[in-house]
């Protein structure tokens, strides 16, 4: 949620993916400073969104999602590299051990992540896994 009179039109919204870590690049952009290559390796400025541009800010988002799980979002898709919630379930709930080795959700069609498509789209799983491995190897999502 943001308010910036004369810049952000009231009642507007965006479906763009942004992350808390994007604040660093956005603040640098606001003051007219470019981030050094080694600063904020996963930070993208979303200042253009605040100014009304509706262009993609970040190509993907990688997040450590608890207990050895990684979450990777690109476009409409979200890959989770493990079973269950990664430790975010209510206390006392059993950890799921049955089912696919990971989770894949189409967030446009299933924002609540109820329909795991991991076994139905192995090509998307492979593509996102390859992208995530590159992020893990380089230690960054920003070029």
Regions of interest found by a model, annotated:
Residues 3-5:
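Conserved nucleotide-sugar donor-binding
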Residues 124-128:
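Short amphipathic alpha-helical coupling segments at ligand-binding clamshell hinges
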Residues 7-12, 16, 21-103, 107, ...:
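C-terminal cap/loop subdomain of S1 sulfatases and analogous C-terminal strand-loop tails that border
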Residues 115-123:
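Active-site-proximal N-terminal segment of extracellular/periplasmic enzymes that hydrolyze or transfer
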Residues 110:
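Intrinsically disordered, low-complexity polar regions and short flexible loop motifs
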Residues 29, 52, 120, 130-134:
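Residues within well-ordered alpha-helical secondary structure of globular protein domains
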Residues 129-143:
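Charge-dense polyanion-binding interfaces
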